[in-house]
Amino acid sequence: MSESAIADFVSSFIPDTATHVEPVRGRVVMSKRRIVLAADDEKTTIPLNGVFDVQHETAPGDLARFFEDTVTIAYEHDEDRHVAVIEGGGSTVDRFVTLVFKALVHGTTVYAKHPARRGGRITDQPFEKGNLALSPGDLTITGDADTTIDLSTVSHFERVDREVNGSNKQLLSVRHMGSTGPITTELALSSGRKMNLLGRYIRLQYTHLKQELADVTLTSEEIEALVAIYSSGPNASLAAVLGVDASRVTMLLNDLIEKELVTDDDGIALTSLGRAAVSEHIEDVNL
């Protein structure tokens, strides 16, 4: 591959589910234009402009005997559809998946209505043109529609039909947290393929955090503390907001830090899991 590699690691993979029944061991090399799966006696090239779906999940039943987790890449090449499966565990693969999505949708033109709703109220905000940019945990829209969606705070998303600049379009409606509470942003892309990929990326972030959050038990007092930190920032007077003394606040914060919902490295701040918890519970709290 002549272009520079942005990912290069060794893994087990099934180069093509139509022709291989068992995984092989080899290198996974990615550039800005393609992914190459290279084993001892063969090489499979996946053109990124042909990729129409990417999934990162627990291995389905027929692959569970080979893999615990998988990255499945579906793509078109020479007018045929193919599916490649890569072993999906570990931080290296997590970074690889993010790089794949960045290569697929980064810089794509988007029309965004932000916010389309504040809480349950529809706004009169117009659709504005921008470009997509992905960074760890964030979806940023640059240009006229200048905004950033913290993906850890997404509580719901769906495809809906809306009129955009005089024509009916299918778009993504994303409910997430804004600076003052829940808002909804609507995103329209001209490419159905890229719309599907963006939706898949949002779902991936959403699902992984929800799975982590399902293992965390929170008391009503802990939820109130998380919402107070979100609403007031590192200078929040939790003792005053919660009506408890300083020693109780210290105990609460220690519990939240242990549950990886809060960090105190540079002042009190929510982790991505903590922000997801706020998004899940904020409407249950009246501060």
Swiss-Prot record:
- Keyword Nuclease annotated: no
The alphabetized UniProt keywords are: Chemotaxis
Q: Name one GO biological process term.
A: chemotaxis
Record note on disruption phenotype: Deletion has only minimal effects.
List, alphabetically, the InterPro entries matched.
CheF1/F2, WH-like_DNA-bd_sf, WH_DNA-bd_sf
- Cross-referenced Pfam families, in alphabetical order? CheF-arch
Summary of subunit composition and partner proteins: Interacts with chemotaxis (Che) proteins as well as flagella accessory (Fla) proteins.
Its function, per the record, reads: Involved in taxis signal transduction.
What name does the UniProt record give this protein? Taxis protein CheF2
Q: Which organism is it from?
A: Halobacterium salinarum (strain ATCC 29341 / DSM 671 / R1)
> Gene for this protein?
cheF2
